[in-house]
Amino acid sequence: MQLPSVFLDSLKGTKGFDQTTFEKLHVSGEQITSIRLNPSKSPIGNHQPCLPAGRLPIENKIPWTEQGYYLKERPSFTFDPLFHAGCYYVQEASSMFLEQALKQTVDLSKPLRVLDLCAAPGGKSTHIQSLISPGSLLVSNEVIKSRCNILKDNIIKWGCENVVVTNNDPKDFAKLENYFDVIVVDAPCSGSGLFRKEPDAIEHWSENNVALCSQRQQRILADVWPSLKEDGILVYSTCSYSKEEDEDIVKWMNEKFLAANCQLLISENWGITKTDNSFRFWPDKVKGEGFFITVFKKVHHEDDHKTRVTKRLNEISAPQTELVKPWLTNSGDKLFVHGFDGIYMINKDFQPDINLLYSNMRVAYFGVKLGELMKAKLVPAHSLAMSRLLADSVMKIELNREQAIRYLQKKDIDVEKSQPGWQLICFNNHPLGWVKVLQNRLNNYYPMELRILKDN
């Protein structure tokens, strides 16, 4: 791998940059694979986090995150049913430092409104969701519609019920003044931190592109800043090494918005480079890709402008509610409403927030879609199968690995005859989706758009 000389020259003098070891690492071809476990996905009836050790080549723990692990090699995640069950997320190790940024600056035990502004494909959103309290609401946003669909799929797979997925430009959030307690901006960037992982990105790097990215990052931050509360926290990160997208942005935020910098404590053993009030991850010093992260606190308060609620979600009827309740383990604090294409469930406390977002944003998904009512019966949605709130009494069919892969390919599966009706397909007690057992056959209801296309 040949790194452009103009790129290397641009990094000279940057704290932590060692050209010799940096170039050597990129030539070595070494690849790092890491995962983050889903602490809420555990065998049905057992609420202990599941580490699929024996199934994945776990090497050791990532030191700055509770649920992160390095793998000895990269397996075929496509053919691991536990991946499709949402038991873990394949995520770059350096970016998991977000956990330290949040834990050290925010009381995560309190109910919070959190915005993940540039959220697709969902790594940071699923991470945030695992860290915040059940009474907190996460708005997970992606401006590009196709990527927003991928984000929605990953949110559903994670089993979240306190997340709203939106498809908005950052400027749209200016309408929600002083609304969020925490905003995470993993900004679009020139991508130099991923050169080792994605060598083709080298061809697209240029000084001009760095300048364009810096301007776009400033626009994004200026657009979203009004929606942050006074004393709120904004976490800014990139996968770029260029100071124009990193330290220069910090200086710009300090000067333009009087944003204060938050201090974080890190271990010297982690190999992370501290630059003023920010942190750089150099791949020749840490076991991860290139990454930059900093944390701002809003100390200047803008005047409030009341955001109007013009739309409200309509609750389903009492008889319909009685048809839905048996599918759920606990529905006491839940509200059942008519959504885009069926019945959705939300936490009652979130109703004002979701009505506000529904009135002012392009909401793509919220809460948990339960399904559709047909002939006074619920046709369950895939998202209900993925939800942690599904009742233990729901009938289940346990599959072996070969059967599970066939199910995920949306092929016919041979299982022992079972009681007719909707049944939950499981692998190692982890739900994968639905089948409907009929008298002479079994219908596979795994979503067509999620099916495995490759042969094992």
PLM region spans:
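S-adenosyl-L-methionine
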Residues: K152-K175
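Short Gly/Ser/Thr- and charged-rich N-terminal loops/segments
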Residues: C50-P57
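C-terminal catalytic and target-recognition region of SAM-dependent MTase-like enzymes
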Residues: C239-G342, F350, G433
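Conserved class I S-adenosyl-L-methionine
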Residues: P111-C118
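Helix-to-beta-strand junctions that scaffold the AdoMet/dcAdoMet cofactor pocket
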Residues: S133, L228-K229
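Mobile active-site "lid"/loop adjacent to the S-adenosyl-L-methionine
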Residues: S146, V185-D223, C239-E247
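A short acidic, Gly/Pro-enriched loop at the edge of an enzyme's catalytic core
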Residues: K175-V182
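Polybasic, low-complexity RNA-engagement segments
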Residues: M1-N38, V299-N456
